[in-house]
Amino acid sequence: MKRRKWLNITWAVTIYIFFGMINVSSYNEGRKRKNKMYSFVINGYNEYKNKYSFLRKPKNVVHMENNNFDMDRLSLLKNLEEESKIITEGEGWDKTHPLLEIKDLHAIEIEGEKEILKGINLEIYLGEKHTIMGRNGSGKSTLAKVIAGHPYYKITKGIIKYKGLDLINLPVNVRSLCGIFLAFQYPVELPMVKNNEFLRAALNSHRRHRNEEEISVSEFNLMMIEEIKKVGLSSEFLDRPVNYGFSGGEKKRNEILQMLILKPTFCILDETDSGLDVDSFKLTSNVITNFSNDNNSFLIVTHYKKLLELLKPNFIHIMHQGKIIESGDFSLVDKIENKGYSQFLKE
């Protein structure tokens, strides 16, 4: 009975301390993986340890080595409490080196072992905005997910470095603390988690990592009054469950709100412009433009020229069958508009 209670409440706590739930199922490929998810751990444990006091080490436990339940629990807490000690920048790295460096990257699907990425090479420096374009199924979203650490994909060859660190060996929670942010193409609903609690837990995780004092509820609420206005959402969205009952456009704007709160260094936007009406599109584009500066970088996945006209990316990359087959400036977008992708394909 105690074991069952532990499992049930652990699930509830995990919902709070895990950030950025990802729906692993592909909406276009069917529903067979619909319920599979994974999370970017952001360690919101401290906010809830008073509520869930059972997580603390009980005083009467003596033989911990013989108690798997308590060993698992203490292992979880140890990982959470050491987040401020995580190294998120490689020795000797500075702004003269690429923020993100990818060399000959190959990746497969865990299920079926189908190779999706077939030799990606890419360098992104601080202050740059890069755009990935290509036909459906070319591997654009897969590249975004692999960088973020999606468990549905396995890297079989190649290198990914972020701030000089070997990103391949970094767990997803460390990638988040490093400053990597992914705005999902299909944001997941969390019906049991209030939006304001989710956002504050995420923010405090990053503040703890920077050895900063956690933000109080009152301070957070004051900050959110201004931040939520930027994305065109009313304050009532903060008291609603994360993305639950939101329209497609509201979900996308809520993703951008998370970006504003966390202030990541490397932002991956996976078709953030899809599902937005005209007004939301302009508003979201302006928010992204204003957020962009010399101390952050963007990787933008999109099909639409209109977004790029507003964001003005430094580089355009065209993907086809898991490879980047063409890179250049904005003139590539005009060529795609006029003659499509076939002009870049080798016969």
Curated annotation (Swiss-Prot):
Induction: Expression is not affected by oxidative stress. It is an enzyme of class 3 (hydrolase). Its main location: plastid. Pfam families: ABC_tran (PF00005). NCBIfam families: sufC. One of its GO terms (cellular component) is apicoplast. It comes from Plasmodium falciparum (isolate 3D7). Belongs to the ABC transporter superfamily. Ycf16 family. Pathway: Cofactor biosynthesis; iron-sulfur cluster biosynthesis. Keywords: 4Fe-4S, Apicoplast, ATP-binding, Hydrolase, Iron, Iron-sulfur, Metal-binding, Nucleotide-binding, Plastid. InterPro entries: ABC_transporter-like_ATP-bd, ABC_transporter-like_CS, FeS-cluster_ATPase_SufC, P-loop_NTPase. It is found in: Plastid, Apicoplast. It comes from the Eukaryota. This is Iron-sulfur cluster assembly protein SufC. It catalyses: ATP + H2O = ADP + phosphate + H(+). Participates in the sulfur mobilization (SUF) pathway for iron-sulfur (Fe-S) cluster biogenesis. As part of a complex consisting of SufB-SufC(2)-SufD, involved in assembly of [4Fe-4S] clusters. Exhibits ATPase activity. Disruption phenotype: Parasites require exogenously provided mevalonate for survival. No significant effects on apicoplast morphology. GO terms for molecular function: 4 iron, 4 sulfur cluster binding; ATP binding; ATP hydrolysis activity; metal ion binding. Proteolytically cleaved.
